[in-house]
Amino acid sequence: MSFLVAIVGRANVGKSTLFNVLTNSRDALVFDFEGVTRDRQYGQAKYDDLDYLVVDTGGISDKDVGFDEFMAKQSQIAIDEANLVFFVVDGRSGLTTGDEYVASLLRQKDKKVVVVVNKVDGTDEEAAMAEFYSFGFDKVFAISAAHRRNTQKLVDKFLKKPLNEYYQDYTQTQEHKEQQRHGIHFSLIGRPNVGKSTLTNRMLGEDRVVVFDMPGTTIDSVSIPFERHGQKYTIVDTAGVRKRGKVKQTLEKFSVIKTLQAIQDSNVVVAVVDARQGISDQDLSLIHFAIKNGRALVLAVNKWDGMTEEDRIQVKQDLKRKLFFLQDYVDIHFISALHGTNVGHVFESIDTAYACANKKITTADATRLMQLAVEAHSPPMVGKFRIKLKYAHVGGHNPPVIVIHGNQVSRLPNSYKRYLENFFREALDFRGTPIVFEFKQSENPFADRKNKRSKDEGSKSKKVK
């Protein structure tokens, strides 16, 4: 589960600009749910070698009603889940009643809050920050997100320490969780109302989860351990459900954050798609996020029953076009969660994907496969010399990491890297799991000796003179 930074504040203070700076505008996950008037942005960022999630919460106002009230609740969910809150205000326009409203909400939470005074370019920083100390938060810092002024200092000063502390604690906790983990841990992800809860009940064989037609009405992710044919599992239904005891509550708490964290905490991710609605940009965002995080993947296309043959052909063509990047290594099952059609095959693919993601490969086998790949198709020339791959070994599991050492590997083209991935995947029969390749430049064992010899020869020549 990643460290989470929530960017909050009233509208038009520069939250999205700061989001883009922290994430380098890359891999933004934008979700546009039915009944939601504004997109939400979730991004992955990195500080040193540590990953963290950033959420741009949208504007919070005391006048939020209707859909805006829904979005305000989403912002409060983000605050509740956050490890660190960047409360962004406008240093140019000064303190407003809207800022005071957001501050009052944050004071009710036991959260680490940094008041980020934005848009201070051309103004005196100390003067711009002064009035915002009245909120009662100790940490106040001035930046210009648009010009990247002080943004690196912001993360160095306020993010570095809590991020490192979090991952020190998380590593110890994660080791304990792995020891206590009940079998294969898999999550069901997808848009609200695609049938995840029905599929959960079908997999469990009982009505453990109450199903609702209204999208986005969830209290929390539901985690349930169970056993099937001697294999232990833990299933996580990430959204679209409410626990039986909470039926009377009307909280609309669909949390994308919960979904992203469930993906990171799973061995295998089952992406559930509604066959009648087709695959959406949001589905693709979740699938990309799972792959980027190295998660084994299975695709379940639900509500397949009752569709005409013509519609089924159209759905399959649409899937092939939009999921081309999966390179046919992910199993796709056309199911009916309601009637149980093909659900058993989903379990088979979960087992296969988990086994492949954790397959043990020796250094000898990895090197042998690399040599076979090179014999079949040599790396390209770089100038007068050919890129040389020397040996390979396994660098990790879930996902499998193959580390290849050689000369000039930094200049290896992406096309050859894809060739190696396909070669290893076919040779090892990897299904459902991404494969991560790392390329490392081999050290020249004679470099120091050569330099030393050059120095010795230089000394001798001086003595001769």
Curated annotation (Swiss-Prot):
Positions with a binding annotation for GTP 2: 190-197, 237-241, 302-305
PROSITE patterns according to UniProt: G_ENGA
GO biological process: one example: ribosome biogenesis
Region annotated Disordered, chain positions: 446-465
Domain KH-like: 359-443
Oxidoreductase keyword on record: no
Superkingdom classification of source: Bacteria
Keyword Repeat annotated: yes
Chain ranges of the EngA-type G domain: 3-166, 184-358
Residues the entry annotates as binding GTP 1: 9-16, 56-60, 118-121
InterPro entries: G_ENGA, GTP-bd, GTPase_Der, KH_dom-like, KH_dom-like_a/b, P-loop_NTPase, Small_GTP-bd
CDD domains given in the database record: EngA1 (cd01894), EngA2 (cd01895)
Key words, A-Z: GTP-binding, Nucleotide-binding, Repeat, Ribosome biogenesis
Gene Ontology MF, one: GTP binding
Quaternary organization: Associates with the 50S ribosomal subunit.
Similarity comment text for this entry: Belongs to the TRAFAC class TrmE-Era-EngA-EngB-Septin-like GTPase superfamily. EngA (Der) GTPase family.
UniProt function note: GTPase that plays an essential role in the late steps of ribosome biogenesis.
Full protein name: GTPase Der
Gene, per the UniProt record: der
